């Protein structure tokens, strides 16, 4: 009996060690992935922002020039799939486009990462009525992990807009809705030219009290989509209406 107890105890100890090693490896992989995607995004930011030296009496500083001077072309020279640059919730992302799901597990710089990259729906056009962008809902708040805050009106009122920069324009979008829906219903969002689609979206937003403005046929929109975990195969969709377009001076 004592021998059996010793065997069981030893087995439990070994199992515990194995579990610890696997858990530690998983954490290490996750941290490595976080650093990888951060490095890729920082590299993109260093390219998109042209900087000049500014000298004052105390120090030499680096001054970030206005958004109309952003060098999107420099980013495209590194990754030809680059279509623009998104600024939302105090975060900034290079955005790519591909017809497959390549960027679900690939960063902007081409390195494999569970964070992926913010990417445009392969069937969208830059001049379309609704530009759809996808991003992972990371538990640490990275990528589109904080979009759920737009389900609260107070947060939306404090953070009403986000910006989209391409080689041609600097666009400002005003958030008019945040919607929880099923993955199978996302197709309703892709085409906002139809009055029936717009009515469906309005009703979905009204149900959760997160309709912050009116949808209009003929207007231009951007939809930010991520996973939503309060329902099976859920999706969170934050929709902005384009309220300002500036032609880039530095293009």
Feature annotation, model-predicted:
Residues 1-17:
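N-terminal Sec-pathway targeting helices
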Residues 20-251:
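Solvent-exposed, non-transmembrane regions of membrane-associated and secreted proteins
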């Amino acid at each position: 009996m004592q021998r059996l107890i010793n065997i069981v105890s030893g087995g439990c100890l070994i199992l515990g060690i194995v579990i610890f090693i696997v858990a530690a490896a998983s954490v290490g992989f996750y941290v490595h992935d976080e650093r990888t995607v951060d490095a890729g995004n920082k590299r993109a930011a260093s390219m998109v922002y042209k900087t000049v030296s500014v000298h004052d009496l105390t120090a030499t500083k680096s001054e970030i020039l206005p958004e109309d001077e952003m060098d999107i072309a420099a980013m495209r020279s590194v990754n030809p799939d680059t279509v623009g640059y998104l600024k939302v919730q105090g975060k900034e992302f290079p955005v790519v486009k591909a017809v497959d799901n390549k960027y679900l597990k690939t960063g902007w710089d081409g390195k494999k990462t569970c964070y992926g990259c913010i990417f445009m729906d392969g069937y969208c056009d830059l001049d379309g009525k609704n530009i759809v962008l996808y991003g992972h809902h990371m538990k640490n708040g990275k990528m589109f992990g904080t979009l759920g805050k737009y389900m609260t009106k107070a947060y939306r009122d404090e953070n009403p807009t986000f910006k989209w920069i391409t080689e041609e324009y600097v666009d400002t979008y005003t958030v008019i809705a945040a919607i929880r829906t099923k993955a199978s219903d996302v197709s309703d969002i892709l085409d906002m030219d139809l009055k029936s689609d717009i009515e469906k979206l309005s009703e979905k937003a009204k149900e959760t009290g997160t309709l912050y403005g009116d949808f209009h046929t003929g207007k231009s929109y951007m939809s930010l989509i991520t996973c939503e975990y309060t329902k099976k195969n859920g999706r969170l969709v934050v929709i902005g209406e384009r309220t300002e377009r500036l032609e880039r001076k530095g293009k």
